[in-house]
């Protein structure tokens, strides 16, 4: 089984920070924020192992660009990534109730 190095774009990092900050400071729930952060770390570790085996995005434009997705293991978030030269690059993190493939496609234009 291949093991991948996982890197996060600045945008993906900013998106994750925004979700964590919202949970911690707007909803005032430190425990939930810590839980999402732990789930992010756990999902990232899993991504190192399974990145090449997960399905491509449904949106044709993202699929053509090689983007795949992984859902957080315990929360309703998703990472959009592609594999470039054997390295996993996460370019977006979204809540699964968002129209995340459309939002991400528009961001790429």
Please provide the spans of the model-predicted regions.
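Residue-level signal for pocket-adjacent positions within structured domains
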Residues: 1, 57, 98-99
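Arg/Lys-rich, positively charged N-terminal/basic patches that mediate binding to nucleic acids
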Residues: 1-41
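Residue-level preference for short coil/turn positions at secondary-structure junctions
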Residues: 2, 66, 84-86
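A short, hydrophobic secondary-structure junction motif
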Residues: 11, 40-47, 74-78
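Short amphipathic alpha-helical interaction/hinge segments
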Residues: 20, 27, 48-55, 101
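A short, surface-exposed loop/turn module that caps and links secondary-structure elements
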Residues: 45-72
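Enriched for short, Lys/Arg-rich terminal
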Residues: 72-78, 82-109
């Amino acid at each position: 089984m291949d093991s991948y190095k996982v890197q996060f774009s600045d945008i993906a990092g900013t998106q994750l920070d925004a979700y964590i900050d919202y949970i911690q400071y707007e909803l005032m729930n430190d425990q939930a924020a810590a839980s999402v952060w732990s789930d992010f770390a756990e999902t990232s570790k899993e991504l190192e192992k399974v990145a090449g085996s997960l399905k491509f995005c449904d949106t044709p434009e993202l699929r053509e660009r090689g983007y795949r997705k992984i859902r957080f293991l315990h929360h309703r978030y998703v990472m959009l990534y592609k594999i470039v030269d054997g390295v996993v690059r996460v370019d977006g993190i979204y809540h699964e109730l968002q129209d995340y493939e459309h939002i991400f496609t528009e961001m790429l234009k």
